[in-house]
């Protein structure tokens, strides 16, 4: 079992029940899924760019990536309906906790000029979005073998009803929030 999953069951649940006074253990917020999304607008001109982006995302997540396609045509961006414009991976259960562990302990500390992650990136429904500017913060990506620096969006979906509960949950997992 993943280290953070054990930590959640043993420590985080008790801590959140004390803090918010839940009547049942099932009321305690938990992380439902983590979605990694990489928008690759340059893929319209060059198909190789998309292949490299998918390969990078698969290395980071340890799971097969799905190519996302444009929902409608936009002339300004030279995109037609059905063109590949990005890729995504949805992590759940064990893979999710293992990725979260790597993100907190290894990847986030490798961000240049890091001063903590923004506490303002909650969506009002208990979900958190984190933008990463360079995929090289993940140890799975070898700096010499990348063709371009690409950013990605990490969405952490929780069962929390409010942002306050979600922040308490992520803080319990030792997320380095800015004060």
Swiss-Prot record:
GO MF annotation list: rRNA binding; structural constituent of ribosome; tRNA binding
GO biological process terms, semicolon-separated: translation
Q: Does the keyword rRNA-binding apply?
A: yes
Assigned GO CC terms: ribonucleoprotein complex; ribosome
PROSITE patterns in UniProt: RIBOSOMAL_L5
Q: Which domain of life is it from?
A: Bacteria
Q: What Gene3D superfamilies does this protein map onto?
A: 3.30.1440.10
Coiled coil spans: none
Provide this UniProt record's keywords sorted from A to Z.
Ribonucleoprotein, Ribosomal protein, RNA-binding, rRNA-binding, tRNA-binding
- How does this chain assemble? Part of the 50S ribosomal subunit; part of the 5S rRNA/L5/L18/L25 subcomplex. Contacts the 5S rRNA and the P site tRNA. Forms a bridge to the 30S subunit in the 70S ribosome.
Identify its protein family. Answer: Belongs to the universal ribosomal protein uL5 family.
Give the function comment from the record.
Answer: This is one of the proteins that bind and probably mediate the attachment of the 5S RNA into the large ribosomal subunit, where it forms part of the central protuberance. In the 70S ribosome it contacts protein S13 of the 30S subunit (bridge B1b), connecting the 2 subunits; this bridge is implicated in subunit movement. Contacts the P site tRNA; the 5S rRNA and some of its associated proteins might help stabilize positioning of ribosome-bound tRNAs.
Question: Mind telling me what this protein is named?
Answer: Large ribosomal subunit protein uL5
Gene this chain is encoded by: rplE
